[in-house]
Amino acid sequence: MESIEQRVKKIVAEQLGVAEAEIKA
């Protein structure tokens, strides 16, 4: 079972990835 911290970090990483993709596009 993932801890809340791990889940938050995963979500943040995904959001940053999307932001980077949009900036580079």
Curated annotation (Swiss-Prot):
Residues in Carrier domain copies: 2-25
Source organism, top-level taxon: Bacteria
Keyword Cytoplasm attached: yes
InterPro entries with a match to the protein in the record: PP-bd_ACP (IPR009081)
Pathway membership: Lipid metabolism; fatty acid biosynthesis
Tagged with keyword Lipid metabolism: yes
Keyword vocabulary terms for this entry: Cytoplasm, Fatty acid biosynthesis, Fatty acid metabolism, Lipid biosynthesis, Lipid metabolism, Phosphopantetheine
Signal peptide start-end: none
Subcellular localization: Cytoplasm
GO biological process: fatty acid biosynthetic process
Post-translational events: 4'-phosphopantetheine is transferred from CoA to a specific serine of apo-ACP by AcpS. This modification is essential for activity because fatty acids are bound in thioester linkage to the sulfhydryl of the prosthetic group.
Major subcellular location class: cytoplasm
An annotated GO cellular component: cytoplasm
Membership in a protein family: Belongs to the acyl carrier protein (ACP) family.
Protein role: Carrier of the growing fatty acid chain in fatty acid biosynthesis.
Protein's recorded name: Acyl carrier protein
